[in-house]
Regions:
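Conserved, well-structured ligand/cofactor-binding cores
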Residues: 1-321
Length: 321
């Protein structure tokens, strides 16, 4: 997440067009967008760490056959767990309920689910970057991705987003591992009566998921995010042309009038600003105040058209809106 946070700070004053349903939406800052990416990874990592802690603290050592601990010393599980904790420096602890710990692998399923969530976050981030870097002439073109594999077998000069696409493929594999682990925890498949028999497969899939995610995250940052560049001219140019600029006029001229203005601007090929000036809906000074893109990236501080306190990539009020 550090690379994403760095970009969020670097580009926090650049205003761009937000997009929902792949359609133009109201303005936002590039820094806010990247703060959302960073928060995804940070939240996912925190959730995974909590799940891994619960997994480490649920060792079924000492339960023997069915969880009763027959034919073993009463302190066997505690002592072995303590020894493992000391040698490996991992917070291992004996399970508090051996019947749950041996008959199921619910904590493994939970931990795998958190890894799947990280995979989904990485896939979303990689795909968004790929979309924002589409072009260079006929796509969105807001981001310029590092040319890690320039050229095409048939199209000279083409640069494909291969790092983003490789990360997306890795995340598919992690999600496949999660399905396998979930199946291993099912009653009648892995978990049956007093013993889960699928731990070899579940452990292998879990370890492979961790390896894949670690490598993918490292490569995404080193080979893509660190070298990302922003085409500020393109990003800010979209903002002025966006019909959603009229959203800020709705509280002033009414929703229906703002919608009518957007339709007229679209039909005439004019911007919202140009159309509003032509129709003389507001005085030029007032129009300039309400059509200030930067003020649209924050909550209104009382109808003045000026923004309130900064939130998003600065971290003062959490994630971006």
């Amino acid at each position: 997440a550090s690379g994403l946070r760095k970009k969020a700070r670097k580009w926090d004053r650049v205003v761009k067009t937000g997009r929902t349903h792949l359609q133009d939406a109201t303005p936002m800052r590039v820094g806010q967008e990247f703060s959302g990416f960073a928060a995804q990874i940070e939240y996912g990592t925190t959730r995974a760490e909590r799940a891994m802690k619960r997994l480490a603290e649920n060792l079924p050592i000492g339960g023997t056959a069915v969880g009763t601990g027959i034919n073993t010393h009463a302190e066997f599980g505690r002592r072995v767990s303590a020894s493992l904790k000391k040698r490996l420096r991992i917070g291992f602890a004996e399970a508090t309920n051996h019947f749950e710990a041996q008959a199921t692998r619910d904590c493994v399923v939970e931990a795998s689910g958190e890894l799947r969530t990280i995979a989904i976050s990485l896939s979303k981030i990689a795909n968004d970057i790929r979309w924002l870097g589409s072009g260079p002439r006929c796509g969105l073109g807001e981001l310029v991705l590092p040319a890690t594999q320039p050229g095409s077998s048939i199209m000279p000069g083409k640069v494909n987003p291969v790092i983003c696409e490789s990360v997306m493929q890795v995340t598919c594999q992690v999600m496949g591992h999660d399905l396998a682990i979930s199946t291993g925890g099912l009653g009648g498949t892995g978990s049956l009566l007093q013993l889960n028999v699928a731990m070899p497969m579940m452990a292998w899939a879990m370890i492979d998921s961790i390896r894949l995610l670690a490598n993918a995250a490292s490569i995404l940052q080193d080979k893509c995010i660190d070298g990302l560049e922003l085409d500020r001219t393109v990003a800010e140019g979209y903002v002025e042309r966006s019909l959603m600029m009229g959203t800020s006029l709705a509280p002033v001229i009414g929703y229906e009038n703002a919608a009518r203005l957007a339709k007229q601007a679209h039909a005439s090929g004019l911007t919202i600003r140009e159309m509003a000036l032509e129709l003389e809906l507001l005085e030029p000074e007032m129009l300039a105040t309400h059509l200030d893109p930067a003020s649209m990236t924050e909550p209104d501080s009382g109808g003045s058209g000026k923004s309130g306190k900064t939130r998003g990539s600065t971290g003062r009020k959490g994630g971006g809106r």
